[in-house]
Amino acid sequence: MRRADDGSLILDKGLVPSKTRRIRVRVKMNDKVTGTSNPVKSASSDDESIEGRILQARDTLFEEELFYELVREARILGPYGVSTRQNLIRFPVSEEQEVMLDLADADQESDEATDESHEHDVLADSIGHSIRILLTFSHRQNLYRRTQPPPPLSQRRRHTPEYLLLRPVLVYLQHNSHVRWFESFLKDMYRLLKSAGVDCDYTATPFASVDLQHKTRFPKVETLIHAIFAPLESTFSGTLVTPKSSFKARIRTNVLGHPFGTNHEIFMNMPHHSDIQAPARMGLGHEAAAVLTHFIMLDVVSAISLHRPQGCLAWEAAYPHHGELLTTSPTTGGQKKKMKFTLARNEMTVQVSGIRGTGVDGSQTWKSDQTSQQPSLMEFVADVSKE
């Protein structure tokens, strides 16, 4: 910047980027762009003024540094699905959704503008704001380190750690995806149980570990950053079929500590199967859903064996882990009928046959999306248990 002959200020054009550049965030769902971040507005009202051009250069420099640090971090996140190619960073959120980040001109339009929707614009904007806040926080951390006494001199070159920019975003998106999937599973399962006349319910507390209202001595921005870096945890609890039977589930996603990623834990309270517990830690939501489905099946088998209306045959759980029950005749003591119970996410079936499998005495199927009126589970059991 220098003075012209008339005393006005002149900014050397060679020092100012020819175009404003920004980080563009796009969200894809099933190979279709469903969200794009909005361009960052300049702080100056007049882009042609000296002040406006200086602010443009500052913003472009910030965006270029941000993209450089994003690429630097993305190179160590290959095992988590993050890939870089030329001027593009992309990573999957779920099987259907992925996020793409690139450094583009502010006035550049997307190549897929004709197919774009705006369903996930808010998500794209949130990711863009998050990575900018995290870079600013990293600058603050660098300033703090420079004010501290330097470490002892060493011949080893000190490695500059990658900034935490993508990892907190990855963890949040991954945790949110796992929580939404598990909650949809519970919704289907409990809708199925209620369609069979079972009185039970569940409670979901997504992001139970996040408490931004808690008062601390830190500024609000740092409190937000500390909440982003902390492990994310969501909890679920619910009642089952038999009295006093219940479950608790916890989904935990870690940012910094080991193990990095999402783990599922299930805790069962089943008085009739107190010796059986779920695996300590499961990495996949499908595994946790399969374990919980099996425990619900065990509880339904226990409820059927405890249900003994007057004048009906009593059922005993012969092979509870396979959903099989047998009934005996009160007069002869011989086994008369066999019941096979199967349970899936959207369907529950009870089939009763002779002990030797010679014929089917009755069968009933309940579905989570059924609309027609059907007998309840215990009504069907009582009906097929008549002598």
List each model region and its residues.
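Glycine-centered motif in EGF-like
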Residues: M1-T84, L88, D107-E387
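Core residues of folded domains in eukaryotic genome-function proteins
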Residues: R85-I89, V93-Q97
